């Protein structure tokens, strides 16, 4: 198995497909580069999702996240790109990605992007606030 950063996301079968359960993943070491200055940008990513048929395999997610270390991306673009890639590989019932970027020039940036399958609704009110 490779320990090199790569974009090869993997999934496994949802062990409880009949149930809506929330998966929360905290990624405190996200790094990309500012496309204007080339300086590193650091963020904590909070992923929350309700799987449908498959779940995202964590080691592949780690390698995928690491692959952004040398990429120049705006905060808004990289957050939405990551969400798009995760949706494409897993087709979740619901997914939210929150990216909290460290201060840069006295400004903090938080980007929240989310997705919900068509015709799928929460059966009960669910507060998807990460409790990490």
From Swiss-Prot:
Catalysed transformations (reactions): 7-aminomethyl-7-carbaguanine + 2 NADP(+) = 7-cyano-7-deazaguanine + 2 NADPH + 3 H(+)
GO biological process terms held by the UniProt record: queuosine biosynthetic process; tRNA modification
Pathway of action: tRNA modification; tRNA-queuosine biosynthesis
GO CC terms in record: cytoplasm
Binding site for substrate: 56-58, 75-76
Active-site residues from the entry: 34 (thioimide intermediate), 41 (proton donor)
Top-level EC class as recorded in UniProt: oxidoreductase
Domain of life of the organism encoding this protein: Bacteria
Example of a GO MF term: preQ1 synthase activity
Major subcellular site: cytoplasm
Location(s) in or outside the cell: Cytoplasm
Keywords, ordered alphabetically: Cytoplasm, NADP, Oxidoreductase, Queuosine biosynthesis
EC number, as in UniProt: 1.7.1.13
Similarity annotation: Belongs to the GTP cyclohydrolase I family. QueF type 1 subfamily.
UniProt-listed HAMAP family: QueF_type1
Task performed by this protein: Catalyzes the NADPH-dependent reduction of 7-cyano-7-deazaguanine (preQ0) to 7-aminomethyl-7-deazaguanine (preQ1).
UniProt-recorded name of the protein: NADPH-dependent 7-cyano-7-deazaguanine reductase
Gene field: queF
């Amino acid at each position: 198995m490779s320990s090199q950063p790569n974009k090869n996301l993997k999934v496994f079968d949802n062990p409880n497909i009949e149930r809506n359960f929330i998966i929360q993943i905290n990624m405190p070491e996200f790094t990309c580069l500012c496309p204007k200055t080339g300086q590193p940008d650091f963020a904590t990513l909070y992923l929350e999702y309700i799987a449908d048929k498959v779940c995202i395999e964590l080691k592949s997610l780690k390698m995928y996240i690491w692959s952004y270390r040398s990429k120049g991306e705006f905060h808004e673009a990289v957050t939405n790109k990551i969400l798009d890639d995760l949706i494409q590989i897993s087709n979740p019932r619901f997914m939210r990605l929150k990216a909290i970027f460290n201060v840069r020039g006295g400004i903090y940036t938080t980007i929240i992007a989310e997705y919900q399958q068509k015709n799928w609704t929460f059966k009960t009110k669910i507060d998807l606030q990460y409790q990490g």
